[in-house]
């Protein structure tokens, strides 16, 4: 919910120049719906699932990953960083491609790993929506 709250705050602050979809569950990622909507971008903040290659090839999919990529590629990045004793990391924004967390990186922003997991995720969400990949104006749509 904190992700959607921050997405809605960001939406209210910006005029629409691009249509962007923010997906928060795997059930929302339906190619037929995407084909009807034809988004300019699809943002995947805190996404835990593989994105189907058909969607990656057809749309500009931007993933936000909670490590200083290429370090930490793969699943459970927050848990893996904490287990390894890290106290800070970076949020990396990258274009999805057919390889896991390996596309071109557009942005990196510092993220403290101090506090509870909830506090860390809330800070990460604020970074994602306050420092977007393309600092123009966006319009967020939910499917």
Place the predicted regions along the sequence by residue.
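A short beta-strand-loop structural module common to alpha/beta enzyme folds
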Residues: 17-29
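Short active-site oxyanion
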Residues: 19, 38-42
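Donor/substrate-binding cores of folate-linked one-carbon enzymes
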Residues: 41, 45-143
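Short, conserved catalytic or adaptor-binding loops enriched in Gly and charged residues
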Residues: 11-15, 98-99
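Short amphipathic alpha-helix with an adjacent loop that forms part of the alpha/beta core around
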Residues: 30-38
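Short, well-ordered alpha-helical microsegments
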Residues: 6-7, 30-31, 50-53
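Structural motif
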Residues: 1-2, 24-26, 45-46
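N-terminal beta1-alpha1 ligand-phosphate binding loop
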Residues: 1-13
